[in-house]
A protein has these predicted regions:
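Juxtamembrane transmembrane-helix termini in multi-pass membrane transport proteins
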Residues: 2-63, 122-141
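Hydrophobic alpha-helical transmembrane segments of multi-pass membrane transport proteins
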Residues: 142-151
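Hydrophobic/aromatic residues within the transmembrane alpha-helices of Major Facilitator Superfamily
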Residues: 8, 12, 16, 46-47, ...
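Short, structured loop/turn "capping" segments at alpha-beta junctions
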Residues: 85-91, 118-122, 134-137
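Juxtamembrane boundary at the C-terminal end of a transmembrane helix
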Residues: 180-187
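Selected transmembrane alpha-helices and immediately adjacent juxtamembrane segments
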Residues: 94-120
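Membrane helix-loop-helix hairpins that form the core translocation module of multi-pass transporters
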Residues: 32-101, 150-173, 180
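Short hydrophobic "helix-edge" motifs at membrane interfaces and signal-peptide entry regions
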Residues: 7-9, 104-108, 153
Length: 187
C-alpha cells in the first residue's frame, strides 16, 4: 500500500504544471471532447508507466542494494532540483490536428510527451525503490489521472486555484525526503 500511495502522491504533485498537464488543457480547449481525451491519457499513461515500471524493476535486480541505494538517493535529489524548474509547452496552436480522431491523438501525444518526463523518470525510480511493480504503476497512473482529468473537465480554472510554485516546492521537498530515506532505510 505504501508503494501505491507514495507513487500516487509523487506523480500527482509532479504533474501539476507539467507539460503533459498543459497538453491536457490544450487538447481540451482544441477539441472540447473530454471523455476521449481522458481515456487517451489513461491508455497512454498505462502503456508508458508499465514500460517505465518494468525498467525500474529490472534495474533493481541488476544492481546491488548498496549501489542502488546511492543511485536512487542521487536520482531523487536530482528530481527535487528538477521540480523547481517549471515546464513550458511549446505554443503549437497553429498546427493541424492529426486525422486519427481525438482519442488516438490524445494517446499518441501523451505517450510521446511522457518520454523522458519527470513522471516517467519518477516511475522508473519508484519501481526500483519498491518491490511492488503493480502498486507503483497503478499509483503513478492514478496520480496522472488525478492531475490531468480535472484539467480536461474543468480547464484553466483548476490550474488557477493552486500556485504552481508552491506545488513544485512541495514536490521538491518530497523528492528530497525520499533521497534521504533511500540512503538510511533498508530496501
Amino acid at each position: 500500500m505504501e508503494a501505491f500511495l507514495v507513487s500516487t502522491g509523487i506523480v500527482a504533485l509532479a504533474e501539476i504544471g507539467d507539460k503533459t498537464q498543459l497538453l491536457a488543457l490544450l487538447l481540451a480547449a482544441r477539441f472540447k471532447k473530454p471523455w476521449p481525451i481522458v481515456f487517451g491519457i489513461l491508455v497512454a499513461t498505462v502503456a508508458n508507466h508499465a514500460l517505465s515500471g518494468a525498467l525500474g524493476a529490472w534495474v533493481s535486480t541488476q544492481i546491488s542494494a548498496g549501489v542502488l541505494r546511492w543511485i536512487l538517493a542521487a536520482s531523487f535529489l536530482a528530481m527535487a532540483v528538477w521540480m523547481l524548474v517549471p515546464d513550458k509547452l511549446d505554443d503549437d496552436s497553429d498546427a493541424k490536428p492529426p486525422r486519427w480522431g481525438v482519442f488516438a491523438t490524445a494517446v499518441l501525444m501523451f505517450f510521446l510527451a511522457e518520454m523522458g518526463d519527470k513522471t516517467q523518470i519518477a516511475t522508473v525510480m519508484l519501481a526500483a525503490r519498491f518491490d511492488a511493480y503493480l502498486a507503483v504503476v497503478t499509483g503513478t497512473t492514478f496520480g496522472m489521472m488525478l492531475a490531468n482529468a480535472p484539467v480536461v473537465w474543468f480547464g484553466e480554472r483548476v490550474t488557477r486555484l493552486l500556485p504552481l510554485v508552491v506545488v513544485h516546492r512541495v514536490s521538491a521537498l518530497i523528492f528530497a525526503v525520499l533521497a534521504v530515506l533511500a540512503i538510511w532505510s533498508p530496501f
